[in-house]
Amino acid sequence: MLNLSIKKLEQSLVLKNDGYLSIFFLGTGSAFSKKIYQNNIVIIKGDTAIFVDFGTRSPFALNLLGHNVSSIDNLILTHSHADHIGGVEEIFLFNRYGFNRKINLIVPKPYLDILWEESLKGGCSYSEYKDTKHLNIYDFVNYIEPQIIDIDYKEKRLFYKINISGIDIIFFQTKHLPSDAYEIEKHHLTFGL
């Protein structure tokens, strides 16, 4: 039987619990929401907190909850809209230069290359030289690769699975962008969980 409860946060967000699965919404708004932030969540179980997406308003929302981006150990990203990745550059740079640490990034491999080359490289790569080259994504993250799985679905889609500290996560390819494309092959790579 599912034991579900909704609780109002009365103090700063605690990123660990007694081992039960909890989901906290950093925001519930649309891409352009200024008051209720963007639709980004934190999955918490035991000592593990997994942030799912981190949009442009997420650093501010996290600060209001008593944390900064150095509190992030695990990050899943679903697609490259700014309301889902707009705060990631701050995570990368703040952790590298403020705390000399890397976070765990959990995304399917085909999306990792898109994420870096088409979204994050310009703001992160040119911060310094390392061995006479600009930085790459592995200078900022410990990459954890979900494994592709075969699921019999009515149309061809990519599915991936990973277990992070007892939390099973399945990624499934979505038809999100562009909105007028009907075939999955014509869509930019995006995922749901």
What are the residue ranges of the model-derived segments?
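Binuclear metal-dependent hydrolase catalytic cores
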Residues: 1-193
